[in-house]
């Protein structure tokens, strides 16, 4: 039996234009725990997954970003709380899928560096 080459996702990197502005957004608005930062990077802990904000080393890395789906318990309450912290949302919380008695809700937002991310919540219907 072949074992998996990839064991797990250990870190997600997000390119930023202004590290201090991004650091404030992820720490103060999203409430992530800052592990440490340098002049060009900041590392956060998010329930066992490390999130790295980085000033791109090369121009070709400046635009590459993935959507990060942040799981929350109550998407509507979290949405309202983050609106109060002036987080810019692209839409409102909405159902994207229903599997049996479980609904998957999402709402997309922009960080201060123009990266798109989302809140995700699975709710018993």
Give short role names for the model-derived ranges.
Residues 1-5, 85-125:
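Vicinal oxygen chelate
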Residues 1-20, 66-68, 121-125:
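N-terminal beta-strand motif that seeds the catalytic metal site of vicinal oxygen chelate
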Residues 13, 40-41, 106:
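A short, glycine- and basic residue-enriched loop/turn
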Residues 22-27, 82, 114:
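Conserved active-site tyrosine of GNAT-family acetyltransferases
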Residues 31-36, 89-93:
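Short secondary-structure junctions
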Residues 33-66, 116-122:
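Conserved short beta-strand elements that form part of the metal-binding/catalytic scaffold
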Residues 71-87, 91:
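Mid-chain, well-packed structural core segment of small domains
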């Amino acid at each position: 039996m072949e074992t998996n080459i990839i064991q797990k996702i250990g870190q997600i990197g997000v390119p930023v234009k202004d590290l201090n502005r991004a650091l404030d957004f992820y720490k103060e608005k999203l409430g992530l725990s800052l592990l440490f930062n340098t002049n060009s990077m900041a590392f956060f802990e998010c329930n066992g997954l490390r999130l790295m904000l980085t000033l791109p080393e090369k121009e070709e890395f400046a635009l590459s970003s993935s959507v990060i789906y942040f799981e929350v318990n109550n998407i509507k309450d979290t949405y309202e709380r983050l609106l109060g912290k002036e987080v810019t949302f692209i839409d409102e919380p909405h159902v994207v899928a229903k599997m049996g008695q479980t609904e998957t809700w999402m709402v997309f937002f922009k960080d201060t560096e123009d990266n798109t991310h989302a809140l995700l919540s699975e709710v018993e219907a």
